[in-house]
């Protein structure tokens, strides 16, 4: 995430961090969900034109991936709740409190989940490696491989791929 953040600062107007966040979440979800159980779109594809309620729709849960939670996202969460679905916001650590505060200000405290992406991914790596350090790199490698395939399938910039040497 730090590399994506640095690259984004060097290239104003780009959304590297948000793209990496969204596709790593997708890769993690691919690890646990049955194949084709949810759609994966390019990070720049807006929810509205594609008639989606969020970045990922899985059963009655709507996952929103963002590096900058704001009023528009909270409105989407309100719509999700009105439609009987459960919104989850996955964001960077620095924005978790922002999202929680926005949800609280909108009267949604306790009704919208807000997760730090690094904790979300880390917990998965530990769980799938059964907390065995010798298996952790293999699990991480699997997530990164899935991420790289998602980037190749949905994005035009192959430099978004992650190189990882499992040891």
Task: For every predicted segment, state its role.
Residues 1-13:
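A short, surface-exposed helix-loop junction/capping segment
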Residues 12-167:
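Catalytic core segments in nucleotide and nucleic-acid processing enzymes
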